[in-house]
Amino acid sequence: MQRIIIVGIDTGVGKTIVSAILARALNAEYWKPIQAGNLENSDSNIVHELSGAYCHPEAYRLHKPLSPHKAAQIDNVSIEESHICAPKTTSNLIIETSGGFLSPCTSKRLQGDVFSSWSCSWILVSQAYLGSINHTCLTVEAMRSRNLNILGMVVNGYPEDEEHWLTQEIKLPIIGTLAKEKEITKTIISCYAEQWKEVWTSNHQGIQGVSGTPSLNLH
């Protein structure tokens, strides 16, 4: 049984899609500890719809799409670390964080510090935008300073030369490359999952560098 935390260099970089792919690939369950905003179409709903994975209830459901500590303040809720407990399961578990690694979680603690003591592996999601290389390097540095087990990185929308540069500079394996899809469907998720699953099952230590554009293989 593996517990894998999916974290991003920022918010909106593709963590939920990566979570859905891995949940499908590893036949894993899914848990979002804190859902901030979009309660009617939560990340748990999206992951379940795309992958069919069982999604555990969130520890906190907050109304505003803000960092957890701010959304909790607006809702007059106090986020307590003692209430953020990974669900008990014998299945693989994908855990998706809210926002970036160093986003404020409680009123006093950053998200990375809240989860760094957990017995989990980590996957970092990086999306290409102006400043993303800097954000990626800073996030990796922060994760390594906490001695986390980083399985690798998923890159989203990077040109090939920048993807290569990241690999050489950061020295993390590229687990997968997300292409710019017109629409994210169950078929797209399934296609990515099959590619990633093949590599994962061939290496008991985890995914080691699979990339590609599954949508090109649908025919």
Curated annotation (Swiss-Prot):
Assembly information from the UniProt record: Homodimer.
GO molecular function: ATP binding; dethiobiotin synthase activity; magnesium ion binding
HAMAP family: BioD
Essential cofactor(s): Mg(2+)
Active site: 32
GO CC annotations on file: cytosol
Compartments reported by the entry: Cytoplasm
UniProt: Mg(2+) binding residues: 16, 43, 96
Enzyme Commission identifier(s): 6.3.3.3
UniProt record similarity statement: Belongs to the dethiobiotin synthetase family.
Full protein name: ATP-dependent dethiobiotin synthetase BioD
Binding site residues for ATP: 12-17, 43, 96-99
Any GO BP: biotin biosynthetic process
Top-level division of the source organism's lineage: Bacteria
Lineage: Bacteria, Pseudomonadati, Chlamydiota, Chlamydiia, Chlamydiales
Pathway per the UniProt entry: Cofactor biosynthesis; biotin biosynthesis; biotin from 7,8-diaminononanoate: step 1/2
Name of the gene encoding the protein in the UniProt record: bioD
Reactions that this protein is recorded to catalyse: (7R,8S)-7,8-diammoniononanoate + CO2 + ATP = (4R,5S)-dethiobiotin + ADP + phosphate + 3 H(+)
This protein's UniProt keywords: ATP-binding, Biotin biosynthesis, Cytoplasm, Ligase, Magnesium, Metal-binding, Nucleotide-binding
InterPro entries: DTB_synth_BioD (IPR004472), P-loop_NTPase (IPR027417)
EC class of the enzyme, as a word: ligase
Protein task: Catalyzes a mechanistically unusual reaction, the ATP-dependent insertion of CO2 between the N7 and N8 nitrogen atoms of 7,8-diaminopelargonic acid (DAPA, also called 7,8-diammoniononanoate) to form a ureido ring.
